[in-house]
Amino acid sequence: PLAFAQIKVGMVTDAGTIDDKSFNQGTWEGIQKAGKDLGVKTKYLKPTGTTEADYVKEISNLNDAGFKFIVTPGFKFETAIFAAQDKYSDAKFVLIDGSPNNGAFDSTRQEKVGPNTVSIFFAEHESGFLAGVAAALQIKTGDFGFIGGMEIPPVQKFNWGFQQGVAYANKNLGTKITIKDENVIYQGTFSDVAAGQQLAAQMFDKGVKVIFCAAGGVGVGAINEAKARAAKGVWIVGVDVDQYSQGEYAAKKSIILTSAMKRIDVAAYDMIKAEKAGKFPGGQTLTFNAKNDGVGIPAVDPNLSADTAKKT
C-alpha cells in the first residue's frame, strides 16, 4: 500500500459540481467518509474544461501535490486514466463506471486496466428492476416513462431493468402499468436541464404518472417540472443517489417516488479501505451489485407504503 502515514486521496470532478446530487457528490461523500474513518487526507480539483487534456492536467496537479490515490467518477475519464496510469505508475487510480482505453473505436483501440488501477462497474439493471417493481406496486395503474441522458450501457441498463421490473409486477403482483415506446427517450446529453424539463412536461401532458430519469442534469429539469405539477400527483424515480431531498417542494413532501441507486460512495470508500489494508485490487475490474450492497433502492422511502416496501 501507499505509505499510509502520508496517504492522500484526490478526486477530479467531471463537468458537474461537487454537490451535483449525483456522481461527483456520491464519490466525494465516500472519500470524505474515508477521511473521517481512516484518517486519510482528501482533496478534489475541478477541471476548467472537459477534454482529456483538462482531466490529465488535474490528475497531474494532484499527483504533484502528493495526492497519489486518485478517484475519478464516470466514463468520461477513460482515456485520461489510460494515459495517467502509465505516466504516474507510482500512483493508484480508481475509475468508477469506466474502463481505461485510448478512445479509438477501430482496430487501433487499446484497453488496459493497469496494475495500479481498479475499474468499477455497477449492476444498474438490478437497481432499475427494484425501482420498477416498487413504482408499479405503489401506483398500480397508468403510464410510466423513461428519460435517459446519453444512450450508453449504464443508462440503457437502468432503462431495461426498470422496464423488466414493471413487467414483473404486472405479471406477478397484479399491477397494470404500461410503458409506451414514445415515452422512452434518450435526450443525448447529461447537462441540458431545459430539455429535461420540456421532455417531462410533454410526458406529463400525455398522462404519464411516473418518469424514471437516468440523465444527470437533464433529470434535474424533469424533477423541476414534476415539482411544479406536484398537486397533480406526478412522480419521478431518481437515479444514482437517493434523490428524495432534491424532489422536496414543501415540508416533508417530495415528488421522488424512489431512487435506483448506485452506491458510488461505497465503491470509493471500499477501495480506499482496501488500500489501507494492503489489499488494493490493482488490475481488476469489479462489479458492485445488489448482493454486495452496491446497488438498490433507499432503505427508507417515505413515498412508498409499508406494503410496497415489504414486497420489494
Regions found by a protein language model. Give the residues of each.
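A residue-level marker of the well-folded mature domains of exported/periplasmic proteins
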Residues: 5-312
